[in-house]
Amino acid sequence: MEDIKDSKVKRFCSKNILIILGFTSILAVIALIAVGLTQNKPLPENVKYGIVLDAGSSHTNLYIYKWPAEKENDTGVVQQLEECQVKGPGISKYAQKTDEIGAYLAECMELSTELIPTSKHHQTPVYLGATAGMRLLRMESEQSADEVLAAVSTSLKSYPFDFQGAKIITGQEEGAYGWITINYLLGRFTQEQSWLSLISDSQKQETFGALDLGGASTQITFVPQNSTIESPENSLQFRLYGEDYTVYTHSFLCYGKDQALWQKLAKDIQVSSGGVLKDPCFNPGYEKVVNVSELYGTPCTKRFEKKLPFDQFRIQGTGDYEQCHQSILELFNNSHCPYSQCAFNGVFLPPLHGSFGAFSAFYFVMDFFKKVAKNSVISQEKMTEITKNFCSKSWEETKTSYPSVKEKYLSEYCFSGAYILSLLQGYNFTDSSWEQIHFMGKIKDSNAGWTLGYMLNLTNMIPAEQPLSPPLPHSTYIGLMVLFSLLLVAVAITGLFIYSKPSYFWKEAV
């Protein structure tokens, strides 16, 4: 009788334990489903596109960007889909032939219509930003600049995209957008999170400074460390992803690579004789004829303009780096500084801080000299040595050594190498701080430059506050999923064991 009673009690208890285990299993399953659904809400795929045309002084580039619509407030999600270089010079050269601008832009715009799905055409914004070449044209003739922009707008409006305007951006904007681009792509606007807890350990990351060198201007932009920006016109305030940034930026018009060369020629031709300029910034044996009207055809050379007894002059290269370097330094006025410290031409420059990303012509010139040196890392001292050796080579030997490089670019590499060294010296970079410069062509398959930052700003894709993140940090989410899964497995094994061998369970329990 006792045995029967005992057996009933055990069966009753086993049944209750199985019910409890079953209930626990249900709770674990519900928890797994709840965490999974909360963390991974199903979202329809929705890709957006944007087009930016960089109308520079020497050429125009078109960039197509794409990004997942549901993540457009996250940092680093925009990808460069395509880059198309428009065939021909910069748009400022079309001031007297604006009727040709439509054909000039056609090839790259047609490519855009092919690459972007037809269903997305009407919602794809198109922006054109013109830089220093058009700034110079506007200085010469505001009417001509307006006519060029009007012709550009007419052409771009004829395509099935959402044309948002063509404008001349300021040097300050160009510097700021370049700074935004490289830090966005490098993920420097996000906060670092701890994987140990549910609470984020917010830590503002160091941003990169930006060094941009174009054909007609150069920009330097960075966040100074504990330093007052003494010239208000060089100070910009940003609030990005919940963090405040005080940024120093300045654009030196006429100090882009091409215009700096024109300045140097205009300066040096004044002391030449007989219409021949022996130029240390070109390889020995190199010769070129230059029209005086072309030399003085830019506002950048007006300060050196004087009546010359000839209409043309001949450049004869002598290939002397030291003399070239000295001639370039004469373009930088260091005689007066109204601030605690300056770069050149009396422009305030706070103490350099942190790492810098150098792009555009900085990158292209350095990339060439890295190939010359057969080394991916070049110190300032090594760069000086390589440039000196390159300049001293005869023009014939240089052409033979680099047959794949266009002669126009090859002939100017001696000057370009010396100019970059001189310009960075003007920016107060030393042997040690040179090591903090990273020469960047692309970051994560996107070109380093101002265009992406320009689009991000105009489409409001960089929020002032940190966007809402998933309910749980990724590591915590994984941990909870594993915990509930293990609990579910443990409950299932225990329940199965009790169900199949109840007598063994109770014997062990007793």
From Swiss-Prot:
InterPro entries per record: GDA1_CD39_NTPase
GO cellular component: basement membrane; caveola; external side of plasma membrane; plasma membrane
Active site (catalytic residues): 174 (proton acceptor)
GO biological process terms on file: ADP catabolic process; G protein-coupled receptor signaling pathway; platelet activation; platelet aggregation; purine ribonucleoside diphosphate catabolic process
One MF term in the entry's GO annotations: nucleoside diphosphate phosphatase activity
Description of post-translational modifications: N-glycosylated. The N-terminus is blocked.
Sugar attachment sites: 73, 226, 291, 333, 428, 457
EC annotation from Swiss-Prot or TrEMBL: 3.6.1.5
Main location: membrane
Family stated for the protein in its record: Belongs to the GDA1/CD39 NTPase family.
Name recorded for this polypeptide: Ectonucleoside triphosphate diphosphohydrolase 1
